[in-house]
Amino acid sequence: MAATDVRPKITMACQVCKHRNYITRKNRRNDPDRLELKKFCPNCGKHTEHRETR
């Protein structure tokens, strides 16, 4: 049942340094595409684009 979970856990990776900084949950029905958010990257020391990784 966990494989077809509506709200799976996803990891967010920085697009600049490629570090996986955040783990969050998303609703697959509302957001079927990959999630892209601007978040703070502690490795870069600034706000950068973070994208969902698989």
Curated annotation (Swiss-Prot):
One of its GO terms (biological process) is translation. It holds the Pfam family Ribosomal_L33. It comes from the Bacteria. The keyword Ribonucleoprotein applies. PROSITE patterns: RIBOSOMAL_L33. Coiled coil: none annotated. Keywords: Ribonucleoprotein, Ribosomal protein. GO terms for cellular component: cytoplasm; ribonucleoprotein complex; ribosome. InterPro entries: Ribosomal_bL33, Ribosomal_bL33_CS, Ribosomal_bL33_sf, Ribosomal_zn-bd. GO terms for molecular function: structural constituent of ribosome. Belongs to the bacterial ribosomal protein bL33 family. This is Large ribosomal subunit protein bL33. It comes from Frankia alni (strain DSM 45986 / CECT 9034 / ACN14a).
